[in-house]
Regions:
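Low-complexity, glycine/alanine/valine/leucine- and proline-rich hydrophobic stretches
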Residues: 130-132, 141-164
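A surface-exposed partner-binding patch
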Residues: 1-137
Length: 166
């Protein structure tokens, strides 16, 4: 994606965020009114990438360094890069190791045979190659894949509903 295309996209997204802020029902998510926090500093993002051995997808990186670093929406809010929640939920993640799932081989629990699913979780397979974008709470999370064995998967957004899988 060219830098001009990214800039145009970011401008459209920023305009839409302003419109969403004025239309959002303040009772629909915790924390009241929707707020977007300032963009993250480029050196801080570069340091995070170096620490974890990954390069963030260009469009996400541009958004968090030029539009908003985090916010109070959607759901429980857009997570700030590298900042754990109150339960220190990032301590188990390894964003630099490849995300093991693919579009044809997602992590799915088969109620008829749950063992492979639970074995994969025990091995930490669900904790590799991604960063959290936001959470609905109770184990329902939207994630961004930042490292993947399958190059087509890197940069895609997945929904983890580990609380309700089996």
């Amino acid at each position: 994606m060219s830098s001009v295309a990214v800039s145009d996209d970011l401008e459209r997204v920023a305009d839409k965020l302003v419109g969403l802020t004025s239309r959002r029902d303040p009772g629909s998510a915790p924390g009241g009114a929707m707020r977007w926090r300032p963009p993250l500093a480029e050196p801080a993002v570069a340091a995070w990438e170096a620490e974890h051995g990954v390069v963030l997808p260009e469009d996400y990186r541009a958004f968090i360094t030029r539009v908003a670093g985090s916010g109070t929406w959607p759901f429980h809010g857009l997570r700030e890069l590298g900042v754990p929640d109150r339960d220190n939920d990032l301590s188990h993640l390894d964003p630099g190791r490849p995300f093991p799932c693919t579009f044809t081989r997602p992590l799915v629990c088969d109620p008829a045979d749950e063992d492979p699913y639970w074995d994969a979780l025990e091995r930490g397979e669900a904790d590799r190659g991604w960063i959290p974008l936001c959470t609905e709470g109770c184990g329902m999370d939207t994630i961004l894949v930042v490292a993947a064995a399958d190059p087509e998967v890197r940069g895609t957004v997945w929904y983890f509903d580990l609380a309700n899988d089996c």
